[in-house]
Amino acid sequence: MGKTVLGVFFGLVLVMAGASASYALQAGGVEVGDLETGSVVGQSFKELDVDAQLFAVEIGDLKTWYPPVTIIDFKVRPGRPVLLKVTNKAAAEHGFQMTDAANAGSPFVMKAEVVLKPGETKYIGVPTSDMFYATQGNTLTYRCHLHPGHVGGKILMIK
């Protein structure tokens, strides 16, 4: 009886330890905010250089995120967090979702998501460790998660 209770207790401890690690990975280190008030891993967005600027634009009937491809070379930049500036230049509300498409179904995937009003700008800070370890490949995809028909783009990471 004592061994059974001990075994059940030990099993519950393992399950809880795994669950807490899972929640920690799901939360990730991705932070969304304004330039003045936002921060990631203890560094203010104001102190960081913007690595890429992305814009929701309308070209005729085409609604897209521009530029379609952005390259970040980690071999030549310091190990500081990645800072993205996303701006909605369109007339309607648009979403911005960035994730690793290769393992998007995983509970551990890195994911950033924000909704932008017309003319609104937000900053997305991502720890370098999340860019390397919470992604499977070298490519992140971004798109408007509010309107699936809109054209998205890719961030290519040179590691």
Where do the protein language model's features map onto the residues?
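Extracytoplasmic entry segments of secretory-pathway proteins
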Residues: 1-58, 131-133
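Extracellular/periplasmic metallocenter environments
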Residues: 25-34, 42-45, 114-159
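N-terminal edge beta-strand
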Residues: 45-81
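Short regulatory "switch" loops immediately downstream of catalytic or recognition motifs
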Residues: 52-61, 75, 100, 123-131, ...
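Short beta-strand and strand-turn-strand segments in soluble, beta-rich domains
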Residues: 66, 102-111
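Extracytoplasmic
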Residues: 69-71, 79-81, 91-93, 111, ...
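Asparagine-centered strand-capping/turn motif at beta-strand->loop junctions
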Residues: 86-90
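Beta-strand signatures of extracellular beta-sandwich domains
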Residues: 95-99
